[in-house]
């Protein structure tokens, strides 16, 4: 499928996402980044997959936009400094709060659970994760429940 056809049929997804997150400042820049990502996604989409193109684009563009927000605010999130130091004499170290939480979560998980979580956060569906990890769908569901249980037990 040519990108012009994809664009004509699905460009409203970009407008919807920008409206959903109330983007008014830098609207054109975000639109352009999402349009480039839409082109990239249209190149890797497999029509034989069970997911429709519109669903595929919406999910991946939504996660991409969230990643853009995180990158933009990465230096604004958390500043960590030593408790003993009354003044900042050294360069402060910046950490993204989400990255710190993910690091804590990843420490609790085994290798299969970490891979599942990574793929899930990238926007893959369960059946896609099952194909990538070469596991059955029921095993993927068990891994999902295990990750959920560990997170609830340790972070709630």
Curated annotation (Swiss-Prot):
Residues 126-145 bind DNA. The keyword Transcription regulation applies. Keywords: DNA-binding, Sigma factor, Transcription, Transcription regulation. GO terms for biological process: DNA-templated transcription initiation. Signal peptide: none annotated. SUPFAM superfamilies: C-terminal effector domain of the bipartite response regulators, Sigma2 domain of RNA polymerase sigma factors. Belongs to the sigma-70 factor family. Sigma factors are initiation factors that promote the attachment of RNA polymerase to specific initiation sites and are then released. Sigma-S contributes to the protection against external stress, thus playing a role in cellular fitness and survival. This is RNA polymerase sigma factor SigS. It comes from Staphylococcus aureus (strain Newman). The gene is sigS.
């Amino acid at each position: 499928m040519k990108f012009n056809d994809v664009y004509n049929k699905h460009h409203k997804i970009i407008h919807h996402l920008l409206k959903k997150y109330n983007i008014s400042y830098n609207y054109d820049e975000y639109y352009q980044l999402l349009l480039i990502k839409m082109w990239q996604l249209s190149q890797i989409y497999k029509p034989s997959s069970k997911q429709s193109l519109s669903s595929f684009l919406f999910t991946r563009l939504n996660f991409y936009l969230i990643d853009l927000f995180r990158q933009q605010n990465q230096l604004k999130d958390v500043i960590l400094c030593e408790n003993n130091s009354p003044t900042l004499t050294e360069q402060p170290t910046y950490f993204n709060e989400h990255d710190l939480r993910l690091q804590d979560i990843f420490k609790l998980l085994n290798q299969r659970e970490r891979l599942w979580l990574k793929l899930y956060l990238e926007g893959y569906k369960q059946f896609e994760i099952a194909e990538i990890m070469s596991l059955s769908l029921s095993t993927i569901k068990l891994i999902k429940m295990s990750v959920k249980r560990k997170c609830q037990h340790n972070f709630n």
